[in-house]
Structures are given as C-alpha cells and as structure tokens.
Amino acid sequence: TTRLVGSEMCIRDSYDAEVYRSAFDEAMKNDLNHWVSNQTDGMIDKLLEQAPGERTMLYLVNAVCFDAKWEKPYEKENIQKGAVFTAADGTRQTADLLWSQESLYLSDDNTTGFMKYYDGGRYAFVGLLPNEGVSIADYVAGLTGGKLHALLNDPQHGTVEAAIPRFKASSSLELSDALKAMGVTDAFDSTAADLRAMGGAPNDQLYVSAVLHKTYLELDENGTKAAAVTAVVTEAACAAPTEVHRVVLDRPFVYMIVDTHANLPLFLGTVTQMDG
C-alpha cells in the first residue's frame, strides 16, 4: 500500500495541486506529457521521453506558464529587420531588433541593462548586456544571487534607448548534479533520505533519483510567452531622466522575467545565438 503526504485533500486545498494514481507504464507517461502540454498552453509538449522505470514510485511535477503583453506595444516603425546579432562564437547572424525607449537603467561593473514592463506593471523583462570584452560565459560564472538582487533593487531612472531581438529559447536539464553542488545531498542518497511521510511500501526507502526541468520562452513585438516544468522523480531503493543610455542586445545577453513586487526572477536564461 502507499500513502501520500497528509492526504489528497490536503494537497489539493493547501497547494492547489492535483493528485493522480496510476500504473507506471507507457499510458501514464502519455498522460503526464498531456498534462504538461495542457498546463503550459502547448509550449512544452513533452516532459518524459520514456516510460518510468520499474523502481519509480512517484513524480512531483510543477508547471509555470507566463503569457503577457507589453505595457507599451511596439509599432511597425520600432522593428528593425535584418539587423546583425554577433553570436558567442563570433559569427554574424540576422536578427529583428525591437526598439523602444525605457526609463529604468541597470548597471554595475560588468554589465548594463534595462527593465521593460508588461501590461499591468507587476512583471518586467530585464535584459543584461555584459561589457565589451566580458564573455557571456565569464559573466554568468560570476553572477550571484546577491549581484542580481543588487541590480534589481537599484534601477536608475533615466532614458534608455533599448533594443531586444525577437527570440525563442528552450532548454531541457537534469538538475541533480547542480542541486548536489548546492548542498542538497541527502534527498538523493538512498541510505540517508527520509521521505517516509510521502509513503511507499513498508520495506522501501524512498529517495530522489532525478530532477527534470524544461523551459520554453518566446519573445516578440506583442509580448512574451514562457513556460517551465520541473519533475522530481522519487524511486524506492530497495526620478526625472538626466542621461540617455543605450543598451542594444545584439550580442550574447542575459534575460529575465521578473516579479517586480518581490524583485525575484520567474525565468532566467541567456541568448548566445539566434535560431537557425
């Protein structure tokens, strides 16, 4: 027999979550992928590539979907078609740049950037362009939570001539190693994990065997669509403008979608080249 944390009612009431019981077979894989597609408006159509292994006991799946229009939409005359984007490997690629005038400028010793609001004013796109001579890899390697927090907490009011390329970004990651490097180790250890409250057969020791994460983001003149899905796989072991700034994202950059009320990023990634 198995039991779930607290009860199914508690999970639904406290976390607005859904609970499903199913045989872990090909049909379950298809059902889970269908759920992911529905929850992300089709932006992520598949999370699992293969049916669960025979020792798999539980999937915890979290989906985030973001679809917002710009507070200040782009007009046709704001779109520069056929512009040049210099990729991380130095190749020159074609991009369509979306030009706008923004009022929040971000900067520190290694980057310049800006914030552009979505309709409603709570969420904003943030573009960060490493200084000339600083590679995107080096910049990201030195980017800490503290540095991001400092940037987002201290925007400068001023005129920013900003340009964002139309782009699409997607990723598929297995996060176990990254989480272990951050100190989350016991949950992955079949002898140290204590997940008894989550259930399982009496003789089974539950532990986390994998953390799967997929994202998709699409940005154009209308706004941004983004989605993220994470699955935890549990197995049994046995002021007035005073200066004009210019930030053109025509080479590798960091992007974020930020909740400006909490100053926390919902999505964060890099663009190092244009599609195709």
Describe the predicted segments one by one.
Residues 1-6, 10-11:
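Single conserved hydrophobic/aromatic residue that forms the stacking wall/gate
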